[in-house]
């Protein structure tokens, strides 16, 4: 599944960097690993709108601390590209929720790690900041994309989607 955003104002070219996770406890084959791993070849075959460029496609370890080094490299590369004036940069992360039956688009991320089972490196945090230097667990980051409208648009094209404000809201709905 690829969602396409058409920009009517702003930069003429946007480069999007995509991340997803490898397998994790209880899920031997993570669908996001397949999506991210196959995205470049899919885009080569199907193409993208002229104002959208696929940057990096990176599959991260499903480990809180184990993923940070690779994630920082992806983000630093995007920042360097932006500072060189090559294009505007965007980040899409495909997470996974083993209890979900459909895709969810989220408009915010929370700086909190609370795992119900240990990650792939054995870490099982409870209400701990993912990135301590980014603030407390109440710290959020919100996208400027019109996520609710994107969800509606994807539903109209046949994708079984729903909108949630954050992963925490999605987990609350499932529990």
Regions found by a protein language model. Give the residues of each.
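Active-site-adjacent mobile loop/cap segments within catalytic or ligand-binding domains
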Residues: 171-175
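N-terminal catalytic or cofactor-binding beta/alpha core of small enzyme domains
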Residues: 2-170
